[in-house]
């Protein structure tokens, strides 16, 4: 897939927190749904928990939008359940994730300039 322009990427931004954290769970390699769910919970120290409906609804949309893809890459058979589906981040998904990280970083910089941070509100 050709690299998208910033205007193309801005059409899908901002991402919902669920979609953002699902994408953020995948750059390290393939994961199945339950592993994504646990990684999101761990990354956010329990602040974001994805239920099955939210997780798999988001995965379905991410697959349709080609931000993630199913992969046949699996761990050793002894460690795996053949019913599991594994997902990877696509190049487009990586571009979208990077654009969202830039957008969020800009928002944090702006909040810092306005002296809006914990303890002042």
Where are the model-predicted features located?
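Exposed loop/turn and edge beta-strand positions of beta-sandwich/beta-sheet ligand-binding modules
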Residues: 83
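Short, Lys/Arg-enriched N-terminal segment that forms or immediately precedes the first helix
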Residues: 1-11
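Basic amphipathic alpha-helical segments that dock to polyanions
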Residues: 55-62
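Beta-hairpin "wing" of winged helix-turn-helix
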Residues: 65-80
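N-terminal helix-turn-helix DNA-binding core of bacterial DNA-binding proteins
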Residues: 10-54
């Amino acid at each position: 897939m050709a690299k998208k322009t910033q205007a193309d990427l801005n059409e899908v931004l901002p991402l919902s927190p669920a979609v953002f954290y699902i994408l953020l769970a995948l750059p390290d390699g393939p994961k199945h749904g339950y592993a994504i769910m646990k990684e999101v919970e761990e990354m956010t120290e329990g602040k974001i928990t994805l239920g099955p409906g939210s997780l798999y609804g988001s995965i379905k949309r991410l697959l349709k939008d080609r931000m993630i893809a199913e992969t046949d890459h699996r761990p050793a058979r002894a460690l795996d359940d053949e019913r599991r589906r594994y997902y990877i981040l696509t190049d487009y998904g990586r571009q979208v994730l990077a654009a969202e990280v830039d957008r969020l970083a800009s928002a944090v910089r702006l909040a810092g300039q306005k002296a809006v941070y914990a303890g002042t509100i």
